[in-house]
């Protein structure tokens, strides 16, 4: 029989072999440590009591005699032999009496058992251990592990968001029966009690996207997540796909290094064929690392978590393999990438901004509200609202911005800031709700009971076009009035010249005057007319159009007619309006008013050039729908346009925008009698 010190040495030797990367296949179970032997088969024997042992044990007669004396031959006498008890023990047992359990006590125990069922669940214990170890790592508790782990770590909000996405989905799929109770525990642990149930449900989605600026620790944070999941989640399968092989190999080595130096004493860590596995003696937890050039390696896998790093630069052919895991209800796919807006091919994930469910998470130094103003200011390096802050290890100033743009124009916004230019450009300026409300809700301006609430002044804006090309441009005319804090459209005209042989000024003036006279005839409460004729194209023609309109209107009505006046090159006030930088301000003001429901149309809207073929409001809505913002280059002022390729021009919407813009009292001083 082996002595005690020999058994201890064998046990120690066996533990060393287990920790090695490759240990002999002849290692037997630790259940028979006293008889473990690594000798050749010719020297081995199989004994009923000792199991697999060295044949030299047959020479120890006391050992053989002991085994023979206590050998179990399954004889009936052994099972029927009477057990002997001490008399005092028998008398003490006879005096024991048991009281029946009351119903209240039984119900209390059942309730307590139901409440503690979650905490006894093995899957919950795995999640709880993961949370405990991760918190310990954040607090710097692993002092003997990887360099830097001894320091306390403060997570960025997107990193905490990523961690919540991972653990929430695993909790729901691992413990579906107790999912609600697990989520309540996680909500308390992450201190996100302020979130609504709708926001909580986002964490349980099968796919999510994170767009984060460069150098913010995206890949760095993935490494501890994979490591601690392998340690605590028994049987989990993780996939990691990178855009380059050297990136996936780097993450593989870092995960292996962390696993071996953090918890290799308790578990066997193995690295084979780009797969890191940890043996939990009941099941293995594995993590496979691949590049987008070898996505065939992830085919046929049964991942619970699939991390796609730098997803914007993944080969499009590889996405077919990755997206195939969406059909698996136990797989969570997380796309992580840096924000890059240089070309459409490297920012295709921004299309998810218009997805019916929230799955796009964008981190930027500049919020979307101030992005365009930030772009127009050449020296700005921080958002005006200061809602988003940069980490301490990121240094941004005007010199960095200038230097980056000197190497490559626009590099600061595209590569460093991580702007959301593509998202903002694709964002619709006019909401669907406001367009539907504008189309359906129209006021009756002939209702005599409402005369006292309508404004008494009619504003008309005329944008003349001296061409017969219907695809290029036409004359837009809009008549707008006030109703309390809202604006009413009384008339719309979109006029095109038939040919260049006729007098363009006369034709345009007659069209506008005809509409104005009709509006004034239908609405007798209007007692003042203010007209602005755009003179950017031809100032002389604009003055002549103004004179012709005044002559036609005053010959039919006795209303007071005022024109917007602008000084010409000789500093003489002339009846025309010059559109300049205030166009962008007017458009932004119109968008705000339209989306807020302050722009309405009259049921008795007057139109002689549109009504014959279209509903004037639907015709106007087509141009409103095309309204978009165009940013030419960084440092330049953005402009707005409603022109689209192969679509109608934007003359009518510009006339409506400027008419509502000139309704403000600040412009009243510019209207005078001509």
From Swiss-Prot:
Protein name (Swiss-Prot/TrEMBL): Tripartite terminase subunit 3
Q: Where is this motif: Walker B motif?
A: 305-310
Sequence motif Walker A motif, location on chain: 212-219
User: Which gene is transcribed and translated to give this protein?
Assistant: TRM3
Q: Which family does it belong to?
A: Belongs to the herpesviridae TRM3 protein family.
Organism the protein comes from? Human cytomegalovirus (strain AD169)
Q: Which GO terms describe its molecular function?
A: DNA binding; hydrolase activity
EC number from the UniProt entry? 3.1.-.-
Keywords noted in UniProt: DNA-binding, Host nucleus, Hydrolase, Viral genome packaging, Viral release from host cell
The upper taxonomy is: Viruses, Duplodnaviria, Heunggongvirae, Peploviricota, Herviviricetes
**One BP term from GO:** chromosome organization
